[in-house]
UniProtKB/Swiss-Prot annotation:
Gene Ontology terms, MF aspect: ATP binding; glutaminyl-tRNA synthase (glutamine-hydrolyzing) activity
InterPro entries: Amidase, Amidase_CS, Amidase_dom, AS_sf, GatA
Enzyme class: ligase
Enzymatic reactions: L-glutamyl-tRNA(Gln) + L-glutamine + ATP + H2O = L-glutaminyl-tRNA(Gln) + L-glutamate + ADP + phosphate + H(+)
Described purpose of this protein according to its UniProt entry: Allows the formation of correctly charged Gln-tRNA(Gln) through the transamidation of misacylated Glu-tRNA(Gln) in organisms which lack glutaminyl-tRNA synthetase. The reaction takes place in the presence of glutamine and ATP through an activated gamma-phospho-Glu-tRNA(Gln).
Presence of keyword Nucleotide-binding: yes
Protein name: Glutamyl-tRNA(Gln) amidotransferase subunit A
């Protein structure tokens, strides 16, 4: 880790504007870090040094004339789910082999418009389906964190594992990510980084490979709360190309950092105390409550009674939407094509060879719950549960609660290739137990590092807010961050 790659976005921005450093110097420092570490961590599936240096030179020219954007010269990594013009975009799937789009996603275009520099594309679970980043066609991402005294390789979480690992290992200043059921917040918790899933509709989904369209939402993973606020402001926009984009301008989220939480009501849902929850997670939760209380917030018990139905309902809805969205990949116009004796055979062979096991599992499950005989019993019922979950949150917020504090993961990072989890996919799905409810309700949620477990691995806490009140999450998370401190992995790579 060099001195330059240790700078937060806020610190680097200051040094770039004051001309203490140049964008080219900063970019070269990150490219050097990637070259040294990516063989061990596997966070990047494509590195774009020529593009990065060209963008950095353009940033230096704008900085010299005083026309700098909000992210001028800041090197970022991009999750492989976001379309990047003429650059590898495969959602880490073999089915999209060789695909290079001729267009740019709205979110990444917003970042480039603000002067950010693209370092490359980041590894992820195939089509964003997974909680460990072991489902990538390009192999698993390795968490930069290790348990004290151990050399065992750990998962970084998923699906945005490459984004979280790259930020934690200082291989980018920040990263784009996406969250369908926890894919920003869970990897952030596993890697000691900050991740926010904004309100559904806050960031455009145009140009992002779809998994479950009514749940997917883009957001940033960053080193601290301030950096996450800076990134989200630039990522968010109103977009006519996305019918789910909300006609609301994003405020200056950074202005919320340092604001008082005095008088705020923080809800503690009793349903999040699940059977078998480790004592360390409960203790961390209690610590978070104490920090907020010390800062002047009021802690109140609340009930979200339909929480226990969220996980099965989520996997029904998400798989159903995935089976529909992924029907378009057939090997005809782009991506992998395996020849067959006729067109139907070609479809079957291309999809069988192109999709990994977890993606196939979810397509099959989604097709099943949408089939004529089971639609009412599963899909329709899951959508009704979704409405009830949303209503639970609405009632709590209507009663005066400003934000909700919960755990974000049931454990710290686990080993790559864990046999118990590999043998039972449902156990892996349980990693999303604390995160899926707010995707079902479309609410904003933020994961902030809050401590280390007995093995020296990071643990996070989750804050859930009212629709389009991300500022509340940023100011509340900053209080936790100030109390807990920041966490950096010891370099072994």
């Amino acid at each position: 880790m060099s001195e330059l790659t240790s700078l937060t976005i806020a610190e680097a921005r200051e040094k770039l504007v004051s001309k203490d450093i140049t964008a080219v110097e900063l970019t070269d420092a990150y490219l050097g870090a990637i070259e040294a570490a990516n063989g061990a961590i596997n966070a990047y599936v494509t590195v774009t040094p020529e593009i990065a240096r060209d963008m950095a030179k353009a940033s230096d020219a704008r900085l010299a004339t005083g026309k700098a954007g909000a992210l001028e010269g800041i090197p970022l990594g991009v999750k492989d789910l976001f379309a990047t013009r003429d650059v590898h975009t495969q959602a880490c799937s073999n089915i999209l082999d060789g695909f290079k789009p001729k267009y740019e996603s709205t979110v990444t275009q917003n970042l480039w418009n603000e002067g950010a520099v693209m370092l490359g594309k980041l590894n992820m679970d195939e089509f964003a389906m997974g909680s460990s980043n072991e489902n990538s066609f390009y192999g698993p991402v390795v968490n930069p964190w290790r348990a004290t005294g151990s050399e065992e390789k750990l998962v970084p979480g998923g699906s945005s594992g490459g984004s979280a690992a790259a930020v934690a290992a200082r291989l980018c200043a920040g990263a784009t990510a996406s969250d369908t059921g926890g894919s920003i917040r869970q990897p952030a918790a596993f890697t000691g980084t900050v991740g926010i899933k904004p309100t559904y509709g806050r960031c455009s989904r145009w140009g992002i490979v779809a998994y479950a369209s009514s749940l997917d939402q883009a957001g940033p993973i960053a080193r601290d709360v301030r950096d996450a606020a800076i990134l989200l402001k630039s990522m968010a926009s109103i977009d006519e190309k996305d019918t789910t984009s909300v006609d609301l301008l994003a405020p200056n989220y950074e202005a919320a950092i340092g604001q008082s939480v005095k008088g705020m009501k923080i809800g503690i849902p009793r349903e999040y105390r699940v059977d078998g929850m480790p004592e360390e997670i409960e203790a961390l939760w209690q610590k978070g409550m104490a920090w907020l209380k010390e800062a002047g917030a009021e802690i109140v018990d609340i009930s979200l009674p339909h929480t226990k139905y969220a996980l099965p309902a989520y996997y029904i809805v998400a798989s159903a939407e995935a089976s529909s969205n992924l029907a378009r990949y057939d090997g005809v116009r782009y991506g992998l094509r395996v020849d067959g004796k006729d067109i139907a055979d070609m479809y079957e062979k291309s999809r069988a060879a192109g999709f990994g096991k977890e993606v196939q599992r979810r397509i099959l499950m989604g097709t099943y719950v949408l089939s004529a005989g089971y639609y009412d019993a599963y899909y329709l019922r899951a959508q009704k549960v979704r409405t009830l979950i949303k209503r639970d949150f609405e009632q709590v917020f209507a009663a005066g609660v400003d934000a909700i504090l919960t755990p974000i993961t049931p454990s710290s990072a686990f080993a790559i290739g864990d046999k118990d989890l590999a043998a039972d996919p449902v156990k892996m799905y349980l990693n999303d137990i604390f995160s899926v409810t707010l995707n079902m309700a479309g609410l904003p949620g933020l994961s902030v590092p809050a401590g280390l477990d007995a093995k020296g691995l990071p643990l996070g806490l989750q804050l859930i807010g009212k629709p389009f009140e991300e500022e509340t999450l940023f100011k509340t998370a900053h209080v936790i961050e100030q109390a807990a401190g920041k966490f950096t992995p010891a370099q072994w790579w």
